[in-house]
Amino acid sequence: MFHHCHRILLGESAFLEIRRIQLDADRELRTNFRVFRGSDYAAVVEAMRAGHSELGYLGPASYGLARRVMGERIAPIFRYIDNEGLEGYHSVMLVKADSPFQQVQDLRGKTLGFSDPNSTSGFQVPGWFLRRQGMDPASFFARTGFTGSHEQGVMAVINGTFDAAVVAYSNERRNTFQRMAEKGMIPSGAVRVVWKSPLIPNSPIVIRKDLPAALQREVVAAFAALPERDPQAFRDMSSDARGLAVAKHEDYLDIVAILEENAARRRERRS
């Protein structure tokens, strides 16, 4: 039996979704878990690197960053299967529904909002794919900037701060702007998609591999059983995902490669 207080650290957008599993984990693992909110993904990575958190929920690119600074001390254990049965999601570029822009090419010389430099769908993946399609954001757009989050990116487009923004998108029934409309934050149909990336593997739940092996096994077993043992807690945790799929480092090798190429480009520009 483990008597320490263990920590699950999450990026801000994941915090409210997973908060309910704290008592469930306490009961199943016979130990105290506490859920904390990180200010951003970089804060979650740093907390895990420093040994202040045992578990985390990271974006794919943030996992790549964590792997770069922690090596094999961190590993993914699960990712969500969404309500359409998919184990991945997309980056999409949004514009106002009543704007004249119909495709990315129409946005040459306009402005683009990224969400966060450590975001997979909000920065790393769209930048890489746009360059591959001959539209380097640094020169294609008149101005780019960071909005701070996916929701703020949607608001920046609606408010006219940026002509377009890139955000996360799982499917028509589960995406950033659909959730905002359901909450009454924006009118339904206020934005539309003009570009969509290939499928990105869903964000991983990660664990520190320097934890006792018995605790790691119990954590994995507890998460694996959660969808059937406490369906409501799982729905709260996952935004109505269908289930969990086992995740491994190899699933994120393409994301790691994109991160390395993006980092190399930044080094070249600085030199």
What are these regions (language model features)?
Residues 99, 111-212:
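Pocket-lining segment of extracytoplasmic ligand-binding domains
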Residues 42-56, 69-70, 105, 150-170:
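Short helices/loops that flank or line small-molecule/ion binding pockets
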Residues 46-106, 127:
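Acidic, polar ligand-binding/catalytic clefts
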Residues 1-20, 200, 207, 211-271:
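An extracytoplasmic/periplasmic, membrane-proximal ligand-sensing/linker region
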Residues 1-64:
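Extracytoplasmic small-molecule ligand-binding "clamshell" domains
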